[in-house]
Regions:
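Metalloprotease/metallohydrolase-associated module, dominated by Zn2+-dependent proteases
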Residues: 32-58, 62-69, 79-81, 238-241, ...
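Secretory targeting and sorting signals
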Residues: 1-32
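Metzincin-family zinc-dependent endopeptidase catalytic domain
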Residues: 162-276
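Catalytic glutamate of the conserved HExxH
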Residues: 276, 280-284
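Extracytoplasmic/secreted cell-surface and envelope-processing proteins
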Residues: 155-157, 260-263, 285
């Protein structure tokens, strides 16, 4: 018996056409999604990823966004990241990027560049007479647990010296230590855990990179203007109010600046490690920079070379902490 014949040439053409139509219909839902706002390669600016855009429509999580010399890696939805740099000339330098739970981007910038001028400290109010402060919209609701990086330290500073300076700095914030007669009403807590080989999530260009879940204090290279930098990550607090701190890393720029734990009369340009650390600890616990005209507060954007005055808090520094940790 002869085999069954297939469709003729016209039949095959019709069959092929119907198959192509069917596959096209089936593949509609599988086509790759085109980003609503395709982004250029490399670093982005805040104009490339403007406020109101979405990191979901514009695939931006993990990309670096820059503004005025500072930079941040875009965090996952539901997260805020901030960069705060202590600069040699006292100029405020940093910004904040928030990604809402739905992926929407928003920014906050320091209001003005608080440039220190010659004679500024002499003209500014005394620390115990100056009630100015700024807060960053976040706080540590639990205990801030931090690690000391195991990297190279400045000449003449041992690991024990560095740990002691950092612990004293953090304790100055949590206990609101001051010479103004203000009692401690700040319910903030911290604990040093150990030394770690992990690094602060801050690169040599003073940019906050993606967080690793560890709060690390270390030394290394930063942008030439930054004496030290704090990067902080937070998320909305369940009950509202300031955001809940997730991680805060601190790096001291030992590539471009000298540090000491004991400034003496011979000091000309070294920064007191404990003073700088106290300023950075203020950022960790939610304080922002005090502006021009407030040069004698710990949270002014420069700790001033060879000065130990920032080791203790001024009135405004204490009031800022009280406003967060009631």
């Amino acid at each position: 018996m002869a085999g069954r014949r297939g469709p003729g040439r016209p039949g095959r053409a019709i069959t092929a056409f119907l198959l192509a139509v069917t596959l096209a219909v089936l593949c509609v839902g599988q086509a790759p999604r085109t980003p609503a706002c395709p982004l250029a390669r490399g670093e982005l600016t805040v104009d490339d990823l403007p406020a109101g855009s979405s990191v979901l429509d514009c695939p931006a999580v993990g990309r670096v966004v820059t503004h005025d010399g500072a930079g941040l890696a875009v965090p996952a939805p539901g997260t805020t990241v901030s960069v705060d740099a202590l600069t040699a000339d006292g100029s405020a330098h940093g910004f904040t990027l928030t990604v809402a739970a739905d992926g929407t981007v928003s920014y906050a910038y320091e209001a003005a560049r608080a440039t220190a001028v010659r004679g500024g400290r002499a003209d500014a109010p005394a620390p115990c007479a100056d009630a100015a402060y700024a807060t960053a919209g976040r706080k540590e609701y639990g205990t801030y647990e931090w690690f000391l990086g195991d990297g190279r330290l400045p000449a003449g500073i041992s690991r024990a010296d560095a740990r002691r300076a950092f612990e004293e700095a953090v304790a100055t914030i949590t206990a609101s230590r001051n010479d103004c007669g203000l009692d401690d009403r700040v319910a903030a807590r911290a604990r040093h855990l150990s030394t770690t080989s992990s690094k602060a999530d801050i690169d040599r260009e003073t940019r906050c990179m993606s967080p690793d879940g560890l709060s690390v204090w270390d030394t290394g290279d930063l942008g030439a203007d930054a004496v030290a930098t704090t990067c902080s990550w937070s998320r909305p607090a369940p009950g509202g109010g300031p955001e809940d701190l997730l991680e805060a890393d601190v790096r001291f720029n030992t590539h471009d600046y000298a540090f000491t734990v004991d400034p003496s009369g011979a000091c000309t340009r070294a920064y007191d490690l404990r003073s700088v650390a106290t300023h950075e600890a203020g950022h960790v616990f939610g304080l922002g920079h005090a502006g021009a005209g407030h040069e004698n507060l710990t949270m002014f954007a420069s700790s001033f070379a060879c000065s130990t005055s920032a080791r203790t808090l001024g009135k405004g520094d204490v009031l800022g902490l009280r406003s967060l940790y009631r």
